[in-house]
Amino acid sequence: MALFARDHKVHVRFIEMMPIGMGKEFHGVSEEELLRILGEKLPRFSPYVGEPLGNGPCHYYDVDGFSGKIGFISAVSHKFCGECNRIRLTSQGFLKTCLQYAAGRDLREVIRSGGSDEVLKAVILEALAEKPDGHAFGGGLEKQKDDKTEKLCMAQIGG
């Protein structure tokens, strides 16, 4: 997959396994391990220094001779909660402020009950104010098995 960035001006991103839902059953590959594997197969690569590529948590590498970049989104091995600017709206209208936790707000109910734009905005701002400081993905399964953690799979959440 990484070789696709060699011949195309496309940035290939690897997303670390998120231990939520069914993802808890699998062992993910850390960014360091993937860098080691890629280092055996690819020409020399180095951290990308330049204009930001997008506005998310991905960090990129330049690879000699490649048209595109190789990037990593590593929520477990390189926790980026302090810089997280993401929220997620599920197809059921539920606003999630962190993928690990089941907490959030039911925006569908606000809309269906006739809530005004101002009410909807207030509910969203309230959810954002309660956005957790971080996740406990690396903290062991005992921290992930309480009733506050997400039980749904990424496909059900929208990822």
Question: What annotation goes with each model-predicted range?
Answer:
Residues 1-69, 75, 109-111:
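Radical SAM enzyme [4Fe-4S]-AdoMet core and its adjacent flexible, acidic
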Residues 70-72, 97-98:
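Short capping micro-motif at the N-terminus of alpha-helices
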Residues 78-159:
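Radical SAM enzyme core and accessory elements
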